[in-house]
């Protein structure tokens, strides 16, 4: 099972973590998350994954509260959406998170 994992620094206080596993060319497991550094700690802000056997998006506020959104997508499409969404919207998500809102 080929595995791919990397971390991309988006700014001094923002990074994207990407992990996925393929089997016979299909995504069988993935996590893509936006992390923001606050008070010298990295905190997850947005996490796309397939835990619980379905693709979903977890949105966190600065207090650690979570909202879960079912994506109703296969893992390949969810992984593409996750990468694109974080690449395009991380600055907006960071701003909302630091204000105390859900991104």
Which residue ranges define each predicted feature?
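Exposed, low-complexity/repetitive linear segments and helix-based recognition motifs
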Residues: 8, 55, 80-82
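Residue-level signal for well-ordered alpha-helical segments
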Residues: 7-11, 25, 59, 63, ...
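Acidic, low-complexity intrinsically disordered segments
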Residues: 62-103
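Negatively charged, low-complexity tracts enriched in Asp/Glu with abundant Ser/Thr
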Residues: 1-39
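A short, structured beta-strand/loop element
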Residues: 29-67
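Glutamate identity and glutamate-enriched acidic tracts
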Residues: 3-5, 23, 35, 44, ...
């Amino acid at each position: 099972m080929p595995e791919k994992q990397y971390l991309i620094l988006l700014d001094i206080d923002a990074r994207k973590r990407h992990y996925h596993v393929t089997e016979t060319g299909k995504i069988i497991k993935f996590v893509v998350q936006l992390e923001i550094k606050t008070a010298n700690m990295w905190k997850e802000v947005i996490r796309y994954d397939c835990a619980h056997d379905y693709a979903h998006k977890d949105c966190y506020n600065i207090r650690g509260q979570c909202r879960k959104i079912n994506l109703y997508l296969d893992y390949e499409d969810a992984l593409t959406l996750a990468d694109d969404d974080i690449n395009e919207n991380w600055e907006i998500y960071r701003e909302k998170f630091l204000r105390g809102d859900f991104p």
